[in-house]
Amino acid sequence: MLRLFARGHREEAVFGSLLRRIGCDAWLEEDGKQYKCSDVEGHFGGSLDGVLKKVPDIPLNAPCLAEFKTHGDKSYKALLKDGLVASKYQHYVQMQIYMHKKNLEYGLYCAVNKNDDSLFMEIVRLDRSVGEQFINRSRDIIYAKRTPKRLSESPGYYKCKFCDYSDICHFPKAQAEKNCRTCEHSFPVKDGKWDCAAKALEISKELMVKGCEFHEFIEDFKG
């Protein structure tokens, strides 16, 4: 997994170099760090790959989100055939959230096939309704008292079989770990922090992962 992340990180520099060579201005960092955005009192956010200007087919001085992705051969071919929205809607949503938060009217989706290094690029226009929809969805999930509704009641459903969280979703009572995030006494507060109602204190990162003597599973995780 670390090697996969490293490959993606290397491709960011490659894409930046390629875009500069065709005349684009490319900024991959802000003050020496990745561009970031957040919402829902700091509990939701992400990191932008960069910001571009002078992108062909985009108004000259319009800043543009840069989104760089690596794809396996099957995924890349689906992208070529069907386009971004149909084949990788989650990537499209990610871009819309970043564009909405950073007030960018355009985005450039850049994809590389890890098998043969072929490239795909697609210009994306801002649709604030999509960004707002999924930010509101994240807010509902973050502040929810119960776990979200399952995509399917069958763990054998094809999307569930490929989900990293299938076990905890379909068998929560057997899979839930004891920590503050599974405890009914914890609740999110400002600046991405969590408080404990039982102890009336802010939960540290160290305590968050192990819980305490007052731990009580939320309703969906109780045996």
Where is each model-derived feature located?
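Metal-dependent nuclease catalytic cores that hydrolyze phosphodiester bonds in DNA/RNA
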Residues: 1-65, 72-74, 82-85, 205, ...
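The N-lobe alphaC helix and its flanking beta3-alphaC-beta4 segment of protein kinase-like domains
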Residues: 12, 94-95
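Alpha-helix capping at helix-to-loop junctions
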Residues: 21-24, 71, 100-107
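A structural signal for short, well-ordered beta-strand segments and their strand-loop junctions
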Residues: 27-28, 65-67, 106-111
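A short mid-domain helix/strand-loop element embedded in enzyme catalytic domains
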Residues: 68-72, 113-114
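Metal-dependent nuclease catalytic regions and adjoining charged, substrate-binding loops involved
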Residues: 78, 85-90, 97, 101-200, ...
